[in-house]
Each structure stands twice: as C-alpha cells, then as structure tokens.
Amino acid sequence: VYGFHRAHTGVDFGAPTGTRVKATGDATVEFAGRRGGYGNLVILRHQNGYETYYGHLSAFAPGIRPGRAVSQGDVIAYVGATGVATGPHLHYEVRIAGKPYNPLSVKLPGSPPLAAAQRTRFLQQTASWSDKLGLLRGTNLAALD
C-alpha cells in the first residue's frame, strides 16, 4: 500500500463488511475510535498487561466505549476496511506490556480451573453428548467416489 516495507504487527482475517467481531477474552475497553492506519480501532485491556487490537472496523457495537467491561465472546465491533486497507478484513493484534506478539503463536495464560460445582454441572450437561459421540467410535461410514 505504501510502496515500501513496513512492519505488520498482527494478523489479517478477510471477512465480509459487517461481520461481527467478538472479544477474545474478558477485558475492559481501553480505546474505541479512529487511529491512523488502523482506521476504526478497538483496544481491549486484559489482565496481566495483555492487550488485543481489532482494526479496520466498519462500526463499533452499541455501548462500546472506554471503561466498559466486556466478556469473551461479546460482539465489540464489525469488520470493515477503514484506515489503510485494500479490502474488508479484521486486523487482530496481541500485545504484552506494549510489545506486539504473533497472535497465532503467542503463549497465553490458561483459564483458571472450574470450581467443583461448575465442573459437576459441566460434566452433567456434556454426559449425553459424550455418550452419543461414543456410539460413533469404530463406525465406518461408506462414501461414494
């Protein structure tokens, strides 16, 4: 786009304009607005110095503003092509203590283990599915060539 090489600090995911963008983890909205080549940008601040950037957005989800708490899976914005972009896509970036890391290979902290009551509930809710999937073990499906 610029005619020269410039560091790219994230990963781009092509998607149609308006595709929902979801928070990748529980966080607080640090920034939601326009910022240079990112165009419309949301920055989420997670625990322990982690931040995630979501760039080139067409619009922000209702209520997304600095200070707002979001949960993993909440819709925060919509894919677009704002800023320096040749087509609609999501620019996704992970930063730790301000330094960018490759989102596809960065080692992130795991989730805390479930409390005993939550684990029991999870196992109860998944038992029937586990049984159904168990029936498929050893099953060979015929296919037409």
What are these regions (language model features)?
Residues 1-128:
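Catalytic cores of peptidoglycan-degrading enzymes
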Residues 124-145:
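C-terminal recognition in membrane/secretory proteostasis and scaffolding
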